[in-house]
């Protein structure tokens, strides 16, 4: 393919608002074009990469026994109202009305729609298990789109769904998808971790996340040098709290003017922050019409893990209380909240590290005052103890090794949904005994366009993108140094023909640009192999450069095809080490 015929608008500088390396380089290399905040056009090079990713996905899905289909992106809201996600999904859900004032959404995911098709199409367990998937654009009204195509309002996604008559069928489908996902990411050339994760708004109790370590990752991976890895929302560590043995002292209220944080209160009271209780008021949505105020107590040096609180309460949503909520339930302002004297209408949860404390300090539910020497049971109640904290780096993980943290990009997620959706939407089949039973579901997703950012983050350098050979837009970039010289262009065309006939995809830079511009653009674009046709063309010699390493070698034209094959094979083997 001739480069002069392809839209590749390279730039010398990235936009000033581009933060991530992948964002900067994909714009500079002419892969993407911003239409609006969070909305992108994928230009020819990017689209070629996407198609290669899709082909790998389709191949592995076929091997896993999944069948491709396609759902609409515009969905009637009725099913989402029936499942409860029309409200619980929050502000990220695009909502709209048609001309007849009927509610619709732009699909951020398709559990409900696939479940409806299954419900209306399959009535017997004999038709199960079934695994289906689609490759389709999704829509989420992100509050803060950022990092280019890493977090946008429209993006392509693989979403797959399994339907089984029993738990064994779900387990088999889940394991097959997990294997397929590993194969996909291995073939693409990503460094990734499979981690324990929280299911969030998806429902279900068991899930695993595939996360690509990267500096711009918005998730925190807690992992060890052993087998343990988890999203920070799910991560656990060995409990090391020691029961304090001090004699409970009389509770006292002390003035703490201007102290609104744990550390300010600790300084005012001359206490260690881990002896001060952090009291966080939340409003939990338990059902469509039921809301529960919840006070979560943490040791002062710990942070609340809201995902763990949601799971403990089994609630649909959890929101930090407003100032009005605090006044309504505790007659106080945030910054001076505490558990002493709190009424029964407020549920009190306390982290396990609070349980071992004696003579602790806490807010007095009065501005400018704190209690000291407050003790559980004597001075305030706790309705439920549990692990409600974020783990810390260096703590001991369940596998006995110290935890390490690294940021990661979520590139895939698999869920055991169980009957979360089928029970709500009436997806049932007759079992072997002729009884109606809810279908057992799994859900599986990969962010297709997000993968491009993840690969770029892990592989780009200061000169541009560096694509793995499996998804590069072309295999070889042929550059005649001087397109005005007939011998160089003739050799470039001959090389193009030879490589194409050998099964390689070739981009020939036939532009009448300076050599420096061509080489800079080639580095930006990131094609694995560059073949330079220069002054030695008259002797039948060309230079090969490996984009990833910068290594160069001169070869005769008749040896070129064989050498390119060897180099690409080596790159592929190194990628999979």
From Swiss-Prot:
Question: What Enzyme Commission number(s) apply to this enzyme?
Answer: 6.1.1.15
What SUPFAM superfamilies would the database entry show?
Class II aaRS ABD-related (SSF52954), Class II aaRS and biotin synthetases (SSF55681), YbaK/ProRS associated domain (SSF55826)
Q: Where in the cell is it found?
A: Cytoplasm
Q: Which UniProt keywords apply?
A: Aminoacyl-tRNA synthetase, ATP-binding, Cytoplasm, Ligase, Nucleotide-binding, Protein biosynthesis
Q: Which domain of life is it from?
A: Bacteria
Q: Give the family from UniProt.
A: Belongs to the class-II aminoacyl-tRNA synthetase family. ProS type 1 subfamily.
Its recorded name reads Proline--tRNA ligase
Its gene? Answer: proS
């Amino acid at each position: 393919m001739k480069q002069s015929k392809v839209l590749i608008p390279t730039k010398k500088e990235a936009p000033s608002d581009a933060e991530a390396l992948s964002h900067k380089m994909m714009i500079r290399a002419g892969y993407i074009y911003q239409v609006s905040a969070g909305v992108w056009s994928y230009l020819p090079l990017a689209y070629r990469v996407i198609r290669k990713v899709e082909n790998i996905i389709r191949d592995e899905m076929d091997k896993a026994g999944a069948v491709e289909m396609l759902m609409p992106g515009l969905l009637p809201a009725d099913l989402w109202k029936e499942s409860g996600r029309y409200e619980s999904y929050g502000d990220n859900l695009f909502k709209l009305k048609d001309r007849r004032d009927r509610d619709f959404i732009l699909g951020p995911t398709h559990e409900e729609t696939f479940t409806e098709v299954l419900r209306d199409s399959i009535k017997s367990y004999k038709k199960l298990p079934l695994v289906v998937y689609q490759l389709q654009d999704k829509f989420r009204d992100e509050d803060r789109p950022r990092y280019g195509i890493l977090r946008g309002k429209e993006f392509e996604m693989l979403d797959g769904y399994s339907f089984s008559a029993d738990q064994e069928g779900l387990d088999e489908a889940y394991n097959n998808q997990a294997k397929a996902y590993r194969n996909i990411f291995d073939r693409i050339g990503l460094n990734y971790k499979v981690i324990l994760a929280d299911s969030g708004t998806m429902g279900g109790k068991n899930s695993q996340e595939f996360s690509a370590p990267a500096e711009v990752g918005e998730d925190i991976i807690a992992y060890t040098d052993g087998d343990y890895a988890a999203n920070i929302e799910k991560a656990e560590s060995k409990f090391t709290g020691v029961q304090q043995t001090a004699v409970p002292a009389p509770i006292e209220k002390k003035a703490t003017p201007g102290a609104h944080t744990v550390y300010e209160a600790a300084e005012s009271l001359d206490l260690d922050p881990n002896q001060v209780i952090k009291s966080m008021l939340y409003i939990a949505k338990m059902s469509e019409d039921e809301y529960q105020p919840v006070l979560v107590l943490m040791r002062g040096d710990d942070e609340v893990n809201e995902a763990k609180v949601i799971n403990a309460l089994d609630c649909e949503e959890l929101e930090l209380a407003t100032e009005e909520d605090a006044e309504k339930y505790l007659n106080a302002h945030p910054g001076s909240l505490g558990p002493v004297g709190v009424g029964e209408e407020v549920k009190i949860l306390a982290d396990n590290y609070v349980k071992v404390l004696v003579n602790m300090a806490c807010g007095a539910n009065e501005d400018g005052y704190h209690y000291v020497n407050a003790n559980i049971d004597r001075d305030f109640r706790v309705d439920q103890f549990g692990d409600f904290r974020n783990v810390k780096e260096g703590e001991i993980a369940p596998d006995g090794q110290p935890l390490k943290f690294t940021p990661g990009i979520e590139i895939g997620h698999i869920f055991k949904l169980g009957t979360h959706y089928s029970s709500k939407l009436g997806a049932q089949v007759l079992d072997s005994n002729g009884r109606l039973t809810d279908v057992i579901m799994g859900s599986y997703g990969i962010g297709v366009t997000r993968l491009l950012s993840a690969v770029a983050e892990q592989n780009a350098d200061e000169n541009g993108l560096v694509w793995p050979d499996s998804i590069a837009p072309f295999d070889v970039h042929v550059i005649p140094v001087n397109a005005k010289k007939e011998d160089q262009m003739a050799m470039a065309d001959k090389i193009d023909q030879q490589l194409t006939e050998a099964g390689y995809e070739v981009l020939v830079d036939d532009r009448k640009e300076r050599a420096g511009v061509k080489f800079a653009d080639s580095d930006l674009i990131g094609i694995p192999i560059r073949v330079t046709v220069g002054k030695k063309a008259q002797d039948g010699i060309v230079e090969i450069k490996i984009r990833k390493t910068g290594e160069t070698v001169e070869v005769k034209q008749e040896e070129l095809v064989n050498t390119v094959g060897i180099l690409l094979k080596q790159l592929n083997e190194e990628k999979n080490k």
